Structures are given as structure tokens and as C-alpha cells.
From Swiss-Prot:
Positions bearing the Glycyl lysine isopeptide (Lys-Gly) (interchain with G-Cter in ubiquitin) cross-link: 61
Glycan attachment residues as annotated in the record: 126, 249
Known function: Probable glucose transporter.
Membrane spanning stretches: 82-102, 138-158, 165-185, 196-216, 223-243, 258-278, 362-378, 385-402, 410-430, 453-473, 491-511, 513-533
GO molecular function: carbohydrate:proton symporter activity; D-glucose transmembrane transporter activity; fructose transmembrane transporter activity; mannose transmembrane transporter activity
Name of the featured protein: Probable glucose transporter HXT5
Localization, UniProt: Membrane
Stretches the record annotates as Disordered: 1-43, 49-68
InterPro entries per record: MFS_dom, MFS_sugar_transport-like, MFS_Sugar_Transporters, MFS_trans_sf, Sugar/inositol_transpt, Sugar_transporter_CS
Membership in a protein family: Belongs to the major facilitator superfamily. Sugar transporter (TC 2.A.1.1) family.
Gene expressing this chain: HXT5
Cytoplasmic compartment spans: 1-81, 159-164, 217-222, 279-361, 403-409, 474-490, 534-592
Polar residues bias: start-end ranges: 16-35
Additional facts recorded: Glucose transport is thought to be mediated by two kinetically distinct systems, a glucose-repressible high-affinity system and a constitutive low-affinity system.
Length: 592
């Protein structure tokens, strides 16, 4: 037992004086030093006894074990109706994904609409207007830069004022950006500025929404409820496509101002709905609002404040947060030097979020109408709706696959599926789409084949990488550094989103459907990376994930790892930490 653990005497009382440092996150640090905190060892040696912060001792270990048994029995007796309230609350938080998806779905159509091109495009010598590749790329992609900045900067509002208030604030910022876009008359840079500001808001949403869902939801439903965020994104994309289809025949600004006006309406709806959502109990415990935390837990789990479930969860929160307080506040440097294995975990989050973009999803979602116009379709808006339907329906399957098959299996099999789809899609586009040259009509059969495999690709993406990337990063970090780590990971997602969105018009002009081979190569790399570096987090609490990293479990054996609190006497920990097999056999053969 570490000095830090010995120092802990029990949970905080509601009357305890508690720091409101916005960077205080939970980490079971064992015997390790908390890097980035000056003089940690001296501070620990001279630390006041925890009894100076609290007024009663926590339950003995045997009482906690009995409490855990009572909680397990309580969970077994819970019906689906008992989880209805927390599910509805998480859906309301996940509605932030709908706001993001709506923007993605509508902008893909705006760049093909006549009034939008007339107002914000350039004029040729013959008087016709057009959107250049540069201007199109900037107006589409700058949103992602705003998101990257918002994810890092505005996500701190969740640490300072709570996840709930922080989320409502970033939605207001998003609304301001939408108002600026609607008010644009004929200056493309005004619309451009509005896109940046709305991106700031969405960047904050993408960090705070999954964070709040994962901290409010019961662990047995956490993967499913966090996946609802991605479900809402796909629903927003689909309805955005439908709205563009409904307004495309107008000849004035109704084409694009009506979809933008609905963006504003959705943001107002979310702000109102958020008033009914409970605050994160983890955050409330951290800032010393113990009674509020109990009420939030009881409300979310549809039980009483003195129930075994609430008592056990509060003890877990208070013990780990008090231990973290003695270690000091986290610095940004701790994402690199922290323990257990914080650099590896930070890098893993950055890689997973980057690779999610490098699957090529935004190639289809941002430029779907443009792509299928090139395939030879007369009404590419209709095909965009088909893609939107496939995306939305497929995401329903993810609510099952994420918790049924686990995070690793979803990512690995998702890579395999998308690789196969890209091979066919790109090969047909390169060799069969224009049998008589690009200046001649395209082959209808080849075009239809490409659409079918684009739909297969979207199914593979929507059931695997789309939701799992968010679920995985929400489960991989201790509360102590969670906000910082998630914001860095999300920023990587947005930066790659910007690069892909901006350069896609230029790349497709140069190499056309060879572009599919680029994404295929990224998925081959992703398969190997996930296999060797991404551990399974299914069914684990945030504290148990920390313990897994402390014990140096091999990622490809992490599915066999059992937390210390659940182990039997015959459990072999070394079997999960060592693998004598040659490198190539680890991936392609089962261990005997």
C-alpha cells in the first residue's frame, strides 16, 4: 500500500472545505509520483492527515465488500424502466451530436446550391459564378479549426463551472456563429467567420457531451449511452441532407438560410432540455458538493440517497479524489510524464481520434453530393439522402456492437470491413467508371457499384469506428487529467478533419478515385496499431482502467484481464503481462 493510500482515512463530508481547482482529476496513483507537480514527494511527506479534511473514517474493507454484494443484487433487480430517466437525460446531452451532424449534412449541399454559389462564389469573365476549390475548402474546413480550438479552450468551462453549465455555454457560442452565417449577404468571409465561431461551440460540445454522459450513466450502460452521441450525429447528418433536398429547388436564399435557421432552433431546444439534466456526480464530489452529488446519483439511478449503490459510488469517488488532491493538481506536462503510462494513453487517444478521420468518413459526408455528381448521377442530393439513411440506421447497430463485442473487436473488424470496401470502390472508380475516358459519359453500372460499396463502407464505419472512438477516449483517462487528455484527442480529430476537408477538392481533382487507396492504407495501419496498442475497456470503471495500466497488461491480452476486486485465488496476472510468442504469431494465432 502506498503512502498516499495510507494517508486516506475515508470520504469527504459535505461540510469539508474543498478546493475548486478546475484541473483536479481522479487518478489512483499507487506508489508513483505525480509528474508535473513540483515537490510532490516533499508535499506528500509533509501532507496534513486526511482527518484534517474529513470528519469520519471510511468503511472498512470487509464492509465495502458487503456493500458491493448489495449493489450487485440491487442492479440485478433493476428493470429497464428504472434506467429510463438517465437514458433520456443522456440522449438530451447527446443531442449536441445532432447539432454537429446537422451542420455536416447541410454544408455538403450548400456548396452545390445556386444561390449560395451566386452570393459567395467568384465571377468568371463570361459572368457566371463558381466556388473555387480554395474557397470551398476554406468554408467547409475552417469549421474544424474552430472545433479544435474550442475543444481545448472552451472545454475548460466544464472544469470551472461544471459539465452541465459548460455544455450550455458552448451551445450558446455555437448559436452566435449560426446567427452570423444567416446574416451573411454576399461576403464569403462573413460566412467564414460565422463558421469559425460555430466551430468553437461544437468543439466544446464534442468534449463535454461524451464526458458528461460517461460520468452520469451507469457503467453497464455507459458504452451504449455514449454511443448515442454518434447516433445523434448521424441523425443530424441525415436530416440535414433531407432539408437540403427540400430546399434545393428554391432560387433564393431559402436554399441555405432555412437549414441554418433550423440549426439555431436545435441549439435553443438543447439549452432548454439541458436544464433537466443532473450534473456530473464526479464533478460535484470534486468541488465539495457532497449532498448534491448524492442527489444526482440517486436521481440518475432512480434510487434513494442512502441506497447501497449511492453509498458505494460516493465512497469510490471521495476516496480516489481525496488521494488525488494530496498529489496536487495536474499540469499539461503530466499527459506526457504522468503515471500510470499517461504518455501511452495520451498518444493512444490522439491516434484513435486521428485515425477516425483518416477512415475517410468526411470524404463522403462533406463532399457526398459532389462525389456522386462525378459518378454521373443527375440528382446527387438524392444519393446523399441514401447515404444518410444508411449511416443513421447502421448507427443503431452500434448501440449493440460496442458493448456486445467490445471496443477492440469493433475497431479491428471495422478496419477489415472498410479496407475491403475501399479496394472495390477505388478500383471500380479508377478502372471501370469511365471506359471511354473522362470526357465521355460514365458507366452507370460502375457508378451504381461504387454507390453500393460506399454504403457498405458507411455501415462498417457507423457500427465501429464512429462510436467507439468517442467511447474509448471517455473511458481511458483518470478524472485528474481527463478533461485535458480528451480535449487534446478531440483536437487531433478536428485538425485532421480540417486537412481532409480542405485538401479533398484539390486531391480529387488530381488523382480522382485513387484517393480511396490512400484511406485504405490508413486503415491497414490502423488495424496494426489497434491490435498492439489499444487495450479493452469494456465493462471497466474509470478506476479499474487505471489499475489495468498500472499492471502493464498487454493490449492484445487485455480482454482476459480481471480487476483486483473481482479476482479469484487461481487468477494468473502474469499471463496477461507476458507473451513469449514471436511477433507475427501474436496477431495470427491463438495462444494455447
Amino acid at each position: 500500500m502506498s503512502e498516499l493510500e495510507n494517508a486516506h482515512q475515508g470520504p469527504l463530508e459535505g461540510s469539508a472545505t474543498v478546493s475548486t481547482n478546475s484541473n483536479s482529476y481522479n487518478e489512483k496513483s499507487g506508489n508513483s509520483t505525480a509528474p508535473g507537480t513540483a515537490g510532490y514527494n516533499d508535499n506528500l511527506a509533509q501532507a496534513k492527515p486526511v482527518s484534517s479534511y474529513i470528519s469520519h473514517e471510511g468503511p472498512p474493507k470487509d464492509e465495502l465488500e458487503e456493500l458491493q454484494k448489495e449493489v450487485d443484487k440491487q442492479l440485478e433487480k433493476k428493470s429497464k424502466s428504472d434506467l429510463l430517466f438517465v437514458s433520456v437525460c443522456c440522449l438530451m446531452v447527446a443531442f449536441g451530436g445532432f447539432v454537429f451532424g446537422w451542420d455536416t449534412g447541410t454544408i455538403s449541399g450548400f456548396v452545390r446550391q445556386t444561390d449560395f454559389i451566386r452570393r459567395f462564389g467568384s465571377t468568371r469573365a463570361n459572368g457566371t459564378t463558381y466556388l473555387s476549390d480554395v474557397r470551398t475548402g476554406l468554408m467547409v474546413s475552417i469549421f474544424n479549426i474552430g472545433c479544435a480550438i474550442g475543444g481545448i479552450v472552451l472545454s475548460k468551462l466544464g472544469d470551472m463551472y461544471g459539465r452541465k453549465i459548460g455544455l450550455m455555454t458552448v451551445v450558446v457560442i455555437y448559436s452566435i456563429g449560426i446567427i452570423i452565417q444567416i446574416a451573411s449577404i454576399d461576403k464569403w468571409y462573413q460566412y467564414f467567420i460565422g463558421r469559425i465561431i460555430s466551430g468553437l461551440g461544437v468543439g466544446g460540445i464534442t468534449v463535454l457531451a461524451p464526458m458528461l454522459i460517461s460520468e452520469v450513466s451507469p457503467k453497464q450502460l455507459r458504452g451504449t449511452l455514449v454511443s448515442c452521441y454518434q447516433l445523434m450525429i448521424t441523425f443530424g447528418i441525415f436530416l440535414g441532407y433531407c432539408t437540403n433536398f427540400g430546399t434545393k429547388n428554391y432560387s433564393n436564399s431559402v436554399q441555405w438560410r432555412v437549414p441554418l435557421g433550423l440549426c439555431f432552433a436545435w441549439s435553443i431546444f438543447m439549452i432548454v432540455g439541458m436544464t433537466f439534466v443532473p450534473e456530473s456526480p464526479r464533478y460535484l464530489v470534486e468541488v465539495g458538493k457532497i449532498e448534491e452529488a448524492k442527489r444526482s446519483l440517486a436521481r440518475a439511478n432512480k434510487t434513494t440517497e442512502d441506497s447501497p449503490l449511492v453509498t458505494l459510488e460516493m465512497e469510490n469517488y471521495q476516496s480516489s479524489i481525496e488521494a488525488e488532491r494530496l498529489a496536487g493538481s495536474a499540469s499539461w506536462g503530466e499527459l506526457v510524464t504522468g503515471k500510470p503510462q499517461m504518455f501511452r494513453r495520451t498518444l493512444m487517444g490522439m491516434m484513435i481520434q486521428s485515425l477516425q478521420q483518416l477512415t475517410g468518413d468526411n470524404y463522403f459526408f462533406y463532399y457526398g453530393t459532389t462525389i456522386f455528381q462525378a459518378v454521373g448521377l443527375e440528382d446527387s442530393f438524392e444519393t446523399a439522402i441514401v447515404l444518410g439513411v444508411v449511416n443513421f440506421v447502421s448507427t443503431f447497430f452500434s448501440l449493440y456492437t460496442v458493448d456486445r463485442f467490445g471496443r477492440r473487436n469493433c475497431l479491428l473488424w471495422g478496419c477489415v470491413g472498410m479496407i475491403c470496401c475501399y479496394v472495390v470502390y477505388a478500383s471500380v472508380g479508377v478502372t471501370r467508371l469511365w471506359p471511354n475516358g473522362q470526357d465521355q459519359p460514365s458507366s452507370k453500372g460502375a457508378g451504381n457499384c461504387m454507390i453500393v460499396f460506399a454504403c457498405f463502407y458507411i455501415f462498417c464505419f457507423a457500427t465501429t469506428w464512429a462510436p467507439v472512438a468517442y467511447v474509448l477516449i471517455s473511458e481511458s483517462y483518470p478524472l485528474r487529467v481527463r478533461g485535458k487528455a480528451m480535449s487534446i484527442a478531440s483536437a487531433c480529430n478536428w485538425i485532421w478533419g480540417f486537412l481532409i476537408s480542405f485538401f479533398t477538392p484539390f486531391i480529387t481533382s488530381a488523382i480522382n478515385f485513387y484517393y480511396g487507396y490512400v484511406f485504405m492504407g490508413c486503415m491497414v495501419f490502423a488495424y496494426f496499431y489497434v491490435f498492439f496498442f489499444v487495450p479493452e475497456t469494456k465493462g471497466l470503471t474509470l478506476e479499474e482502467v487505471n489499475e489495468m495500466y498500472e499492471e502493464n497488461v498487454l493490449p492484445w491480452k487485455s480482454t482476459k484481464w480481471i480487476p483486483p476486486s473481482r479476482r479469484t485465488t487461481d487468477y494468473d496476472l502474469d499471463a496477461t503481462r507476458n507473451d513469449p510468442r514471436p511477433f507475427y504469431k501474436r496477431m495470427f494465432t491463438k495462444e494455447k
